[in-house]
């Protein structure tokens, strides 16, 4: 058994195959426990490498377009900008792209921390009603004539990480705003069904075809070019599901093309800690 453990560990150390496991089925109790511990460590190691590869791939894919725009603008300013106005316009474009890159990097880091488990939940008694109400008030929907309708029951509390929960709700609201129609409607509903709080965010926008609904939770997944309009970051729904699951909750979508989407979050209220 020890030779088998050493051989597998050596193979992984040399980087040949991170999927290998010892899989010891016979031996002393001590050897079986040792092999099991090694296999668990190998699983975590493989997951870490895969997450790192995914992060590098995602970052490369999403940072390339704004980087290209910045380089092109720098070249244009250096060669052709002759007036102060042209310089300022070029600098403004560079600033917008740099801000986009900064936002992307921060969201990627947040996602990676959540997946690695290095971002621990800081649960506390949270007034979810107030949290959702505040985020709704902060939404800028006026420019496109979108009306935001609210049906939020008061004084609904849950044991939650308020910062992460705010991020999840904000992402859902932004998603509804970006993919809703001009002069359309967003409806936000929050209520208590017993053990859980239920949050519904509904729009009457472009909707999602059934064959895409299981895929929208993937990082950077885009259904089509029209859904890519806007920030283009494609991290919102993936992060929402990650945050909801960290709270032992669930999220579902009900949608039809050209008929809008309704995202439903099921958030356990949890038990208040005994003081």
In which residue ranges do the predicted regions lie?
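Short helix-loop "hinge" at the ATP-lid/N-box region of the Bergerat-fold HATPase_c
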Residues: 176-177
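Short helix N-cap motif at coil->helix boundaries in the Bergerat
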Residues: 128, 207-218
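Short alpha-helical segment of the dimerization/phosphotransfer core of two-component systems
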Residues: 96-101
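Glycine-rich GHKL/ HATPase_c ATP-binding element in histidine kinases
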Residues: 259-261
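Short beta-strand/loop element within the Bergerat-fold HATPase_c
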Residues: 183-195
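Membrane-proximal HAMP signal-relay module
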Residues: 1-56, 68-83, 92, 113, ...
